C-alpha cells in the first residue's frame, strides 16, 4: 500500500512484512506496484478466495514518467481536443469554478517540471513548489541525472522562447499530455 497517493520515484510501501510501517523502495512506482501485485498472486493460498485491487500512482498529478520513457513522443504534436479553448462560462458551477485549467492552474514548476524557474521570484509562490523539490529529492543520483539530461535542454528552449498567451497554453498542453501518456505507457507495459 502506498502512502497517500504515493510518489513516482522510490515510493514508500506498507506491507505485512514491514509490520504496518512505510518503507522506501528504490524504483518507479508503476513497476514496483505491479511487481507487488504479481508477487501477491503467485504467493497467495490458491485454496482461499481473494480480492486484489491494484491502483497505480500514474497517471496522477504531477505525471512523472519513468526514466526509460522521458523522451517518448517528444517529436509528436498531439492534437488539441475540441474543448481546448472552452472557458466553461455556460457550464454548471462545478465545472465553471474548477481549478484544473491548463491556462490558469497548471503550474510551470510542479506540473510541467521546469525546474530552472523554481528560484525565480515570479514562481517561488507557485502552488506546491515544495512538492516538486521533494519529488526530485527522492530520486537516486542515476534517476536525477537521467531526468536532467532529458528535461533541462527542453526547459532551456522553453525559457528562451518566452512564450505568451495561446502559444504558452499550447506548450503547457503538449508538455502535460506527453508526460501523461508516458506515464500510461508504463502501466501498459506492466
PLM region descriptions:
Residues 2-27, 42-47, 53-190:
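Active-site-proximal cap/lid insertion segments
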Amino acid at each position: 500500500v502506498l502512502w497517500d497517493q504515493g510518489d513516482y520515484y522510490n515510493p514508500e510501501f506498507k506491507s505485512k512484512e514491514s509490520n504496518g510501517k512505510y518503507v522506501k523502495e528504490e524504483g518507479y512506482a508503476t513497476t514496483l506496484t505491479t511487481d507487488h501485485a504479481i508477487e501477491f498472486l503467485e504467493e497467495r493460498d490458491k485454496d482461499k478466495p481473494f480480492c486484489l485491487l491494484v491502483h497505480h500512482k500514474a497517471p496522477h498529478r504531477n505525471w512523472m514518467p519513468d526514466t526509460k520513457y522521458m523522451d517518448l513522443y517528444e517529436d509528436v504534436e498531439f492534437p488539441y481536443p475540441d474543448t481546448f479553448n472552452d472557458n466553461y462560462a455556460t457550464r454548471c458551477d462545478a465545472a465553471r469554478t474548477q481549478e484544473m485549467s491548463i491556462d490558469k492552474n497548471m503550474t510551470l514548476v510542479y506540473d510541467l517540471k521546469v525546474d530552472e524557474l523554481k528560484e525565480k521570484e515570479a514562481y517561488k509562490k507557485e502552488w506546491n513548489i515544495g512538492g516538486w523539490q521533494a519529488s526530485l529529492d527522492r530520486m537516486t543520483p542515476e534517476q536525477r541525472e537521467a531526468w536532467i539530461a532529458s528535461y533541462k535542454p527542453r526547459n532551456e528552449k522553453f525559457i528562451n522562447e518566452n512564450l505568451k498567451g495561446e502559444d504558452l497554453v499550447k506548450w503547457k498542453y503538449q508538455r502535460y499530455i506527453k508526460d501523461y501518456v508516458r506515464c500510461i505507457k508504463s502501466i501498459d507495459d506492466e
